[in-house]
């Protein structure tokens, strides 16, 4: 049985896709810790960072910088963005498939972040969250297209 990220990569599972390339799919986390919480998901099924190809590892940081710039353009993460890889089960990796979290932060958001970390998998307010995810995905896709035109 495929993991959820393999199913997304194979177009067998829907996702709020932002962009993709030969190595990664950029999408919104469906259980976001903060607004515009993005995942960069490997197309390769690689449970650990060391399992990624060298080409994919090289591309990961470049792509994360591009996505972080788009987030900041849209007003997310001006004060900071957590870049997080949970590398293996003991690191709280919920899906055993390499993915990088980009979590926009701002001063004083620790309490709401902690609350969301505790409640993020509960079905509370899912319709509202889904609407927000769709809006964030559209805005991020547009921001990345504009940025690509200026390169």
Label each residue range with its predicted role:
Residues 1-151:
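HIT superfamily nucleotide-processing domains
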């Amino acid at each position: 049985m495929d993991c959820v990220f393999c199913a997304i990569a194979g177009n067998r599972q829907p996702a709020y896709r932002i962009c993709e390339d030969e190595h990664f799919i950029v999408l919104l986390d469906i259980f976001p810790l903060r607004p515009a919480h993005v995942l960069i998901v490997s197309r390769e099924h690689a449970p650990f960072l060391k399992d990624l190809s060298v080409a994919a590892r090289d591309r990961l940081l470049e792509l994360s910088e591009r996505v972080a710039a788009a987030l900041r353009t849209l007003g997310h993460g001006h004060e900071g963005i957590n870049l997080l890889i949970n590398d293996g089960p003991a690191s709280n990796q919920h899906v055993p498939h390499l993915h990088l979290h980009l979590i926009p932060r701002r001063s004083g958001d620790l309490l709401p972040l902690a609350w969301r970390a505790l409640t993020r998998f509960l079905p509370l307010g899912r319709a509202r969250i889904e609407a927000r995810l769709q809006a964030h995905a559209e805005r991020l896709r547009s921001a990345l297209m504009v940025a690509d035109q200026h390169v």
